[in-house]
């Protein structure tokens, strides 16, 4: 992976760099003085795909921008902190998700999900938890009849406490505490099907979940 932060207009006019630009491993970033540079690096760099992260300087560039080396070191350090935090979480939960998925394979042919009828004329909304959800609940609720709502993980209790009952609740979070916090809001009446991860843990018939 190559990260490019500064290219002069003159360089583009003198050399055809199309063969470099079109490569998927080449990413262009904002100037180092831009506040989003470390976040952009974190979004571009995937350790499991790109391997180790190195910074190499062209000596003429380094001599021309003597103060940039320290700035780059700070930005990459910030980016690595972001990546480490996210990567460690993904590694931990990824193993649990994979384990649960494999445990569910033998049940895939046993259970047949019976989903409720959906008005295909409505607009589907997939909701995730966050500040924008809390701010937008009232707007969605005021036009409830035109939406089919899918609530993911912790968005479900947020919707319920805000007076917005989703049509579907989807969760692949392997934390058992999540079930304790999510399911207290589910009305076990009428047309209600539970898709439960690791169905072998329950004696009741549950549908498998991916």
From Swiss-Prot:
It comes from the Bacteria. Pfam families: MptE-like (PF01973). InterPro entries: MptE-like. This is Uncharacterized protein TP_0175. The lineage of its organism: Bacteria, Pseudomonadati, Spirochaetota, Spirochaetia, Spirochaetales.
